[in-house]
Amino acid sequence: MSGGDKRQPEVNIGVVGHVDHGKTTLVQALTGVWTMRHSEEIRRGMTIKLGYADGEVWECEGCGFPERFSPEPVCECDPQASASLRRRVSYVDAPGHEILMATMLSGAALMDGALLVVAANEPCPQPQTKEHLVALEIIGIKNIVIVQNKVDVVSRERAKESYQEILNFIKGTIAEGSPIIPVSALKRANIDAVLAAIEKFIPTPPRDLDKPPVMYISRSFDVNRPGTPPERLVGGVVGGSIIQGVFRVGDEIEISPGVAVRKPGGRVEYVRLHTTITSLRFGSIEVEEARPGGLVAIGTQLDPSVTKADNLVGNVVGKPGELPEPLTTLRIEHHLLEKVVGMKEEARVEPIRRGEMLMLSVGTAITLGVVTRAGKDEIEVQLRRPVVTWPKARVALSRRIMGRWRLIGWGLIK
């Protein structure tokens, strides 16, 4: 990294695909960061929460293609040659296990593009490979690079066969025409080609800096270690992605819909939180202002007990009085898939019925709701917990089928 360069990441790239296909290992090869950080994740050997890591794309003009691209400022052609920093990138490592699909969907709301990881040593597609690709389509992510991983553990013939399986799988989908890069993430082979594809196929989208600032919260923490003296305690931290506008250190902010408070008689109300930004960080980089692009950690004056253990995931951050009112009822213009995805056996998607329970993914919020009205093209859903959203925002719809929440369609909020 070049010493004083404090550029924030410009783009969020999701890393998606079936469980054990090497997503976390790929992120480590691209960034040097192992995103599986929680004790339960390490014990089970799988990503449970969204993992984040910031990486860099360096380019040496003196090298050939694609070896001119590297995640580090080092050069193959000449150790003394200076590479230039093209971009900083935030990677969102989404869990590939079927029981964690809701977590993947909340991460998809933050993504500008995606790396779809497919292991060459298993037939393609696997159930969550299918489900994740449909999720990208539902959320509207068109910039996709396919990473054919684990080519080092298969024969040349199997690698070619796997490549053909991938081509057949993506035909007619949003990923048709996407580049397919064979790699060994474990041995860091062909990582330069992945970076070259990222530069070409996942551009930094235009950002609107003049609108009121808005951020989706996808993680929240208490960063104080046990035993920290009271005078050294710092406020709670919320992490996520800024969608529009600019946040600055010292800004007053509102977090909505806030936290659930039980009132006398057992009624639950949501109370918005108001606080001040004390710090802004992108990975190890501390900045005075943060714009869209990358995953930012906002330090606040909130009591850390409020933010610990992802308590505020699904909330939205804005300036006081500038966020829309939280909604407990949504009218959705919906579109159903033909078939349920993520299951080994194919099943038709039945029409949505009045009275049934659905799981809705709205931004980074995951909430359950009961269908109170079901028309041919429009449904109305009464939510268990309120959400902050905008007209025409996309919503992913899931239904409980054989004990698991399965993607069945998507919609636009009216």
UniProtKB/Swiss-Prot annotation:
It is an enzyme of class 3 (hydrolase). Residues 184-186 are annotated as: G5. PROSITE patterns: G_TR_2. Keywords: GTP-binding, Hydrolase, Initiation factor, Magnesium, Metal-binding, Nucleotide-binding, Protein biosynthesis, Zinc. One of its GO terms (biological process) is formation of translation preinitiation complex. Residues 8-206 form the tr-type G domain. Residues 93-96 are annotated as: G3. CDD domains: eIF2_gamma, eIF2_gamma_II, eIF2_gamma_III. Its cofactor is Mg(2+). Zn(2+) binds at C60, C63, C75, C77. Mg(2+) 2 binds at D20, G45. It comes from the Archaea. Pfam families: eIF2_C, GTP_EFTU. Residues 149-152 are annotated as: G4. It catalyses: GTP + H2O = GDP + phosphate + H(+). GO terms for molecular function: GTP binding; GTPase activity; metal ion binding; translation elongation factor activity; translation initiation factor activity; tRNA binding. eIF-2 functions in the early steps of protein synthesis by forming a ternary complex with GTP and initiator tRNA. NCBIfam families: eif2g_arch, PRK04000.1, small_GTP. HAMAP family: eIF_2_gamma. Belongs to the TRAFAC class translation factor GTPase superfamily. Classic translation factor GTPase family. EIF2G subfamily. Heterotrimer composed of an alpha, a beta and a gamma chain. This is Translation initiation factor 2 subunit gamma. It comes from Aeropyrum pernix (strain ATCC 700893 / DSM 11879 / JCM 9820 / NBRC 100138 / K1). The gene is eif2g.
